Amino acid sequence: MTYLLAIDQGTTSSRAMLFREDLSVAAQAQQEVPQHFPASGWVEHDPEDIWATTLATCRAAMEKGGVTAREIAAIGISNQRETTVVWERASGKAIHRAIVWQDRRTADVCARLQADGHEPLIATRTGLIADPYFSGTKIAWILDAVPGARARAERGELLFGTVDCYLLWRLTGGAVHATDATNASRTLLFDIYAGAWDDDLLRLLRVPRAMLPRVRDCAAEFGTTLPDLLGGPIAVRGIAGDQQAATVGQACFAPGMMKSTYGTGCFALLNTGATAVASKNKLLTTIAYQLNGVRTYALEGSIFVAGSAVQWLRDGLHLIKTAHDSDDLAPLADATQAVYLVPAFVGLGAPYWNPRVRGALFGLTRNTGPAEFAQAALESVCYQTHDLWTAMRADWPDGVTQNAALRVDGGMAVSDWTMQRLADILNVTVDRPVIPETTALGAAYLAGLASGICPPPAEFAARWQLDRRFTPEMDEETRARKLTGWTRAVKGLLASED
C-alpha cells in the first residue's frame, strides 16, 4: 500500500498524519510547541522547537502506522501562515526567534504606512492591508533589531521563509529554498495578480530580494528529504498555508463555497474562482490555491482569537480544566444575562483591523459566573464569524447566496454546542465533515495530486463526507437582540480607545 505523510505545523502544536491512498487516516502524532511572550502583544516561537516537534511527530506517525519511507509516495506540508523565520544560508541557524502571525510589535510601522498613503499600493498588489499580521514588516523588524542583519541580508547571507519554507529547507538539508503561492500571498511582498515578488513593495518595506524563496504551485516537486531523517528519501510534493490547505481539504473548489476553520484563531475563506474580488468591507483578497500555474482566488476574513479564548478560560482564569468543560458550562448560563466577551487580546482582525485595542467583557452582574463566561467566550467566535459572513455577502452579493452552507473544521468544530450556536447566529446551515483534520487532509491531497495517486479536484469533491449538519433553531427576535448587543459591545470597546 502507498501512503501520504502530511505535516500540519500550527501555532500551538505540530502534527503529522499518515494517510492511505484513499485518504483515510492510518496514524497520527502530535506535540505541543512552546510559545514565548517577551512583551505585551509579542508572540514568538523558537524555530528549533518547530523543527524538532515536526520531525518527532513525522517519525512517531510512521512508527504508529508501521510504515517505512519506501511506502510513502510524498509529503505534504501545511503551516501557520505569516509566521516569519530568518536564518543563515550557510548554517541554517535562525538569527532570531520566529515572529508569530499574532505578534503586533510592528503596529507603529503599519500605522506609518497608512499615514503615508501606501495602503492603496499594498491593496492593489497584494490584496492585503498594512497590518502587523503579515510577514513583510516582521522581516524588516528582524533585520533592524539584529546587529548587522540588514547588511548580511543584502549580501545574500540570510534567508527568509514562512514556516513551510523553513521546514522544507531543513527537510532537504538546505538544498531547496522555496514556498508556494498561498504562503507567498501572505507576506505583503507578493503581487497576487502577477504571481511574483513585487519590487515596489520590497523597496517600501526594505526587504532584500536575495532573501526570498522561489514560488511554486501548491502541488509540485519541491525537493526530497535527507535519507537519514525519516529512514529514506521522501519527495515533498505539496505545500499550502493552513487555511488554504483546509479550503482544499474541505473540497471548496467551486466559486461561492465557504469554509471556516476554528483553531487558535478563526479564518473564513470564500472561493471566488478566477475573480479576485477587491473588498470594500475590510476583508482580504488572497490566493486560495494554485494548480498547474492557474490561481484561484478567495475572500478571507481573519479573526485572531477563537480557540485561544477557551485557552484563556482555562489558563488565565482557571475556570475550566479542559477545553471540553466550556461545552458543559455554556448551556448552563443564565439566559437573562447578556454577557459579551470581545476577545481583542492581540487587537481585532477583520473587519475592524485595530491592532491597538484590547479585550473587554460587557454586561457583568453580581450573578455572572463561570457558565456565563464560558458562553460569552464561545459566542464571541460566532459573533465574529457573523461579522465576516456579512462582509463577504456585501463584497460579493452575486456569489454568496443566503442558503449557502458553511463548512467548518478545526478543534472548536468538534463542539456541538458551539456549532449549533454558530448556525443560529449566522442563520445558515453549518456542515461538519467526517474528517475534522481538513488542513492535514488538504496537504496530503496536494501531495497525492502531484504524485498522480489522488483524483482531480472534481472527483475529490464528490468524496467529501458529512458528519453532522447544524440548522438554525433560534428565533429571529432572539438572534437580532444578541447581534445588537454584540455590535454595541464592539462599538463600546473601539470608542474606549479614543
Curated annotation (Swiss-Prot):
Gene Ontology process terms (BP): glycerol catabolic process; glycerol metabolic process; glycerol-3-phosphate metabolic process
Binding site for glycerol: R81, E82, Y133, D242, Q243
Major enzyme class: transferase
GO CC annotations on file: cytosol
Notes on activation and inhibition: Inhibited by fructose 1,6-bisphosphate (FBP).
Catalysis performed (reactions): glycerol + ATP = sn-glycerol 3-phosphate + ADP + H(+)
Binding site for ADP: T11, R15, T264, G307, G411
EC number: 2.7.1.30
Record key words, sorted: ATP-binding, Glycerol metabolism, Kinase, Nucleotide-binding, Transferase
Binding, sn-glycerol 3-phosphate: T11, R81, E82, Y133, D242
SUPFAM superfamilies per the UniProt record, alphabetical: Actin-like ATPase domain (SSF53067)
Annotated binding of ATP, by residue: T11, T12, S13, T264, G307, Q311, G411
Pathway info: Polyol metabolism; glycerol degradation via glycerol kinase pathway; sn-glycerol 3-phosphate from glycerol: step 1/1
Gene Ontology molecular functions: ATP binding; glycerol kinase activity
Function as written in the Swiss-Prot or TrEMBL entry: Key enzyme in the regulation of glycerol uptake and metabolism. Catalyzes the phosphorylation of glycerol to yield sn-glycerol 3-phosphate.
NCBIfam families, per database record: glycerol_kin (TIGR01311), PRK00047.1 (NF000756)
Similarity annotation: Belongs to the FGGY kinase family.
Protein name: Glycerol kinase
Native source species: Afipia carboxidovorans (strain ATCC 49405 / DSM 1227 / KCTC 32145 / OM5) (Oligotropha carboxidovorans)
Gene that produces this protein: glpK
